[in-house]
Amino acid sequence: MALRFPRFSQGLAQDPTTRRIWFGIATAHDFESHDDITEERLYQNIFASHFGQLAIIFLWTSGNLFHVAWQGNFETWVQDPLHVRPIAHAIWDPHFGQPAVEAFTRGGALGPVNIAYSGVYQWWYTIGLRTNEDLYTGALFLLFLSALSLIGGWLHLQPKWKPRVSWFKNAESRLNHHLSGLFGVSSLAWTGHLVHVAIPASRGENVRWNNFLNVLPHPQGLGPLFTGQWNLYAQNPDSSSHLFGTSQGSGTAILTLLGGFHPQTQSLWLTDMAHHHLAIAILFLIAGHMYRTNFGIGHSIKDLLEAHIPPGGRLGRGHKGLYDTINNSIHFQLGLALASLGVITSLVAQHMYSLPAYAFIAQDFTTQAALYTHHQYIAGFIMTGAFAHGAIFFIRDYNPEQNEDNVLARMLDHKEAIISHLSWASLFLGFHTLGLYVHNDVMLAFGTPEKQILIEPIFAQWIQSAHGKTSYGFDVLLSSTSGPAFNAGRSIWLPGWLNAINENSNSLFLTIGPGDFLVHHAIALGLHTTTLILVKGALDARGSKLMPDKKDFGYSFPCDGPGRGGTCDISAWDAFYLAVFWMLNTIGWVTFYWHWKHITLWQGNVSQFNESSTYLMGWLRDYLWLNSSQLINGYNPFGMNSLSVWAWMFLFGHLVWATGFMFLISWRGYWQELIETLAWAHERTPLANLIRWKDKPVALSIVQARLVGLAHFSVGYIFTYAAFLIASTSGKFG
């Protein structure tokens, strides 16, 4: 008999209904649940899939380089980064005739093109690329790496090259190699690239394969390194009148601590960044030699954890048993990795705009907005995933005997206290913040704006002042010119930093007031509620008072019949599902706040944000409605303009989002009945009844329909906001 899909589950393959297809897709990547899976094969499958993932990433980045080199205007943009719009790629078939062709022919192109809002032009320019040939070379190299990754994935599935389980569980060796190799060596290599290629390029010197052995990155070569006079590398930095990409006003320093931004490019000094990466490299190279492997020196992680028993006795046996628990649970490890990566991704969003690393990116407002929003949404999905896998760990991998009275067990023991405290914090934040907003709304509606409750964020202003912002008049730490902190740093990084933090044209430590105070607490409400749902889902994943045997039902189940008084919607999967809505909601508020504050900053009318952000009607009218007007005008009775594609995407995003509700609100019996009726009609309709199917059509399960609804809701939500964000920003600033 021919094998039916899914091959990995023969039980499912014999299912006579369409459930076979959907459940097959849903469990395709759940290797643990597959037939004939062994621990060894599980680890090897995951290892091989990592190579596939790398191949896709390299192929994608190669495609970016290739299309810009082929259809972009990189060489023209390099001549005038502030006034030429960077082109991502051509549009082969612009719909709606001649007006569309004219609307999308821009950036100096001969035909219709898409403008790049990803920041790649600024990035490539900063790291020293200058010509299309450079881009093609990079594309080819990445294509080669992609092929290499695919070969690597295939190779490690061959019997001779398959790693053993013991290799995957050798935590110390893996940590050493990842710290030293992945972070240490790559940071050192990047420092090398910045010093040998990027910094010379910023000073008008082109270093390529044909001359990189002859061009000294520093006039004194390696002399200062070997004689210990490292300070020579910091002497004679680029001047404040330096024109980026030319020798005019340039210096010779390669590793500096200037602080602040390059006046022309509004980005961090390249020599500061080279210094930063060198420091990171040294730290990680040392860190990668700390753990005990073949040589009997260094720390054993197990010994470290076993010794972590807080003396007060309040955490019981502390970290005893954790080493084996974590080392034997892929879900625990994935949860930790996702939690870390989620935080890092959000930090990337925050730092890319406040401390721009790429030349001229700070003046490309649409790109700034797009990159901030992009990284915050990705961070949200990654963080919710961390809790999902944490919950799966508790269901599949947690062993109570191994973890008796340690920190994990004690988390489970006092989960009621954790959940109720989070619940209390969420309720407090929600009612107080909404109360303030609604009060202010009513005052505005009744024509008495002076009766609003406006709270100055004095603690946050004090913290900003401590970092050197002088406009609040606090005179503390770095904003106090007579203090020791101020005097200690005056000769090195401080002048540049203080100039930057008190310069009103950048996004460093923006001035804050009552509107910021309110939206800050709205975002805090979103964060705490999302966390509450996720934490409760993970801590109750094994069982709750209502359903002590929950772990026996697995990660996702709809209900356990009518018998116990309501066991629907309490699986760990349901918690994840609910949390994603809150996560999207929260990031909506975060991005609205960021975008509105920056639009007013860039337009020079910050008072609009300050005055309108203290009540809900202000947000709805002066941010959402006001900024969607250009977008909605992408098509109108008089024709179309270059925003029409975003107008279409805005409508399409709403459609996808609304489709989600069809799956989220409708119930299963209704769909089953509808499907039976449609199937009956199909089988009795001439011509149509020539097409038959083997599987009996059945409605999606409750959990599946929720997943499909959630996917549509999320995708539609993000598409809608992306179109709004890009159109409203590019419509104003080009």
Swiss-Prot record:
Membrane-spanning ranges: 46-69, 135-158, 175-199, 273-291, 330-353, 369-395, 417-439, 517-535, 575-596, 643-665, 707-727
Keywords per UniProt: 4Fe-4S, Chlorophyll, Chloroplast, Chromophore, Electron transport, Iron, Iron-sulfur, Magnesium, Membrane, Metal-binding, Oxidoreductase, Photosynthesis, Photosystem I, Plastid, Thylakoid, Transmembrane, Transmembrane helix, Transport
Residues reported in the UniProt entry to bind [4Fe-4S] cluster: C559, C568
One Pfam family it belongs to: PsaA_PsaB
Single GO cellular component term: chloroplast thylakoid membrane
Enzyme class: oxidoreductase
Cofactor note: P700 is a chlorophyll a/chlorophyll a' dimer, A0 is one or more chlorophyll a, A1 is one or both phylloquinones and FX is a shared 4Fe-4S iron-sulfur center.
GO MF entries: 4 iron, 4 sulfur cluster binding; chlorophyll binding; electron transfer activity; magnesium ion binding; oxidoreductase activity
Gene: psaB
Location (main, coarse): plastid
Species the sequence originates in: Lepidium virginicum
Function noted in UniProt: PsaA and PsaB bind P700, the primary electron donor of photosystem I (PSI), as well as the electron acceptors A0, A1 and FX. PSI is a plastocyanin-ferredoxin oxidoreductase, converting photonic excitation into a charge separation, which transfers an electron from the donor P700 chlorophyll pair to the spectroscopically characterized acceptors A0, A1, FX, FA and FB in turn. Oxidized P700 is reduced on the lumenal side of the thylakoid membrane by plastocyanin.
Lineage: superkingdom: Eukaryota
Residues reported in the UniProt entry to bind chlorophyll a B3: M662, Y670
Subunit structure, as described in the record: The PsaA/B heterodimer binds the P700 chlorophyll special pair and subsequent electron acceptors. PSI consists of a core antenna complex that captures photons, and an electron transfer chain that converts photonic excitation into a charge separation. The eukaryotic PSI reaction center is composed of at least 11 subunits.
Protein residues bound to phylloquinone: W671
Membrane-topology descriptor: Multi-pass membrane protein
Catalytic activity line of the entry: reduced [plastocyanin] + hnu + oxidized [2Fe-2S]-[ferredoxin] = oxidized [plastocyanin] + reduced [2Fe-2S]-[ferredoxin]
Gene Ontology process terms (BP): photosynthesis
Entry EC number(s): 1.97.1.12
Protein location: Plastid, Chloroplast thylakoid membrane
InterPro entries according to UniProt: PSI_PsaA/B, PSI_PsaA/B_CS, PSI_PsaA/B_sf, PSI_PsaB
Residues annotated for chlorophyll a B1 binding in this entry: H654
Name of the protein described by the UniProt record: Photosystem I P700 chlorophyll a apoprotein A2
Family listed: Belongs to the PsaA/PsaB family.
